[in-house]
Amino acid sequence: MKQTEKIEIEIGQKLNSYVLSLMESDGKLLIAHEKLGYSYFGQLSTVDIGKYQEEAGLKDYDGMRRGDYIKGYISQIRRFHFHDTGRRSPFTADSHIVNDAYRMYEHGENLAAILYRIQREKPMAYRRIIRVIQSVAPYFSDFYFQPTEADMVRLQWQDKYSSMIYGPTDLSDGTIRFIALTVLFMQPWLPRVIIIDEPELGLHPVAIEKLSGLIKMAAQKGTQVIVATQSAELISNFEPEDVLTVNQNEDGTTINRLNSEELAHWLEDYTLGDLWKQNIMKGGQPR
């Protein structure tokens, strides 16, 4: 199997860019080259901020405002993973209504605090979240918040047919995941970049369709959403250019973006997911 000698990462945002080259040295990952890019009178210019070092120099670089811009951009990249839904899952954790309410955590452990803040500060957004949840779980009525004297709150809810108060473990795995995904993509304080792994796990087909709409809505608001998925149903709700396939062989890993023109004839009768399952579109198949 061929080994990659160098990995290069480039982040571009309007007139600013950040490039990081990684290489192996004595069994360790080493930063071979690090630089900032900017536009100067219409010409692309770069400045080196680090070479052959173990840690990135961007966080300590104060040489230009663009460095602060890129640092701010990178700091708003968030990754999420809502797979754990057991009796001791992150969704069962208590969270502080102030300290834990600034941004959603990676595994959803502060979901209650985020929802409580949205309810108090953005009631219209909160009501929209409730309606989307009800479109998948019609029995769901509302969340129930009862902060303690220590300003801690836990995720609780009510259904339409009972006065009982339920917890997250009283929801199916797919429903609690869908609730977390709904809050993630409908929150008023969206991060610039959301990275999420297999959000379709355990979701009803109707919920998968709703999820695709939530992803598109967040993207329309300026958030870049990067999703790793194995769901043919999910990608069927997107355009070919929205989908990148990742393939690995003896020459390494390649990433290819699908092309509408190449698939136009097939898409007249089949969905994008159908083409994936039938191995008609390029890539994305186990080898």
Task: Please describe what each predicted stretch is.
Residues 5, 15-16, 75-76, 239-242, ...:
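Short glycine-/polar-rich loops that comprise or flank the Walker A/P-loop
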Residues 6, 150-154, 250-252:
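A generic structural signal for beta-strand entry/edge sites
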Residues 8-135, 141-144:
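Electropositive, glycine-dotted interaction segments
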Residues 13-15, 24, 161, 189, ...:
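A generic beta-sheet turn/junction motif
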Residues 34-36, 178-184, 228-231:
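Phosphate-binding glycine-rich loops of NTP-binding sites
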Residues 124-127, 131-186, 196-209:
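Conserved ABC ATPase signature
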Residues 192-193:
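The start of beta-strands in P-loop NTPase/AAA+ ATPase cores
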Residues 210-287:
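C-terminal lobe/lid and adjacent interdomain/linker elements of RecA-like ASCE P-loop ATPase modules
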